[in-house]
Amino acid sequence: QZKRPPGFSPFRK
């Protein structure tokens, strides 16, 4: 998994 910022939801709109 790539390191993402906290609270980041790419699949949530």
Swiss-Prot record:
- Which positions bear Pyrrolidone carboxylic acid? Q1
Chief subcellular location equals secreted
One GO MF term on file is: hormone activity
**Superkingdom of origin organism:** Eukaryota
Keyword vocabulary terms for this entry: Bradykinin receptor impairing toxin, G-protein coupled receptor impairing toxin, Hypotensive agent, Pyrrolidone carboxylic acid, Secreted, Toxin, Vasoactive, Vasodilator
**Classification via InterPro entries:** Bradykinin (IPR009608)
Task: Name where it's found.
Answer: Secreted
Q: Which GO terms describe its cellular component?
A: extracellular region
Q: Which Pfam families match?
A: Bradykinin
Q: Name one GO biological process term.
A: vasodilation
> Which tissues does it occur in?
Expressed by the venom gland.
Protein role: Induces smooth muscle contraction. May target bradykinin receptors (BDKRB). May cause hypotension.
Q: Which family does it belong to?
A: Belongs to the bradykinin-related peptide family.
Can you name this protein? Waspkinin
Q: Which organism is it from?
A: Parapolybia indica
* Lineage of the species this protein comes from: Eukaryota, Metazoa, Ecdysozoa, Arthropoda, Hexapoda
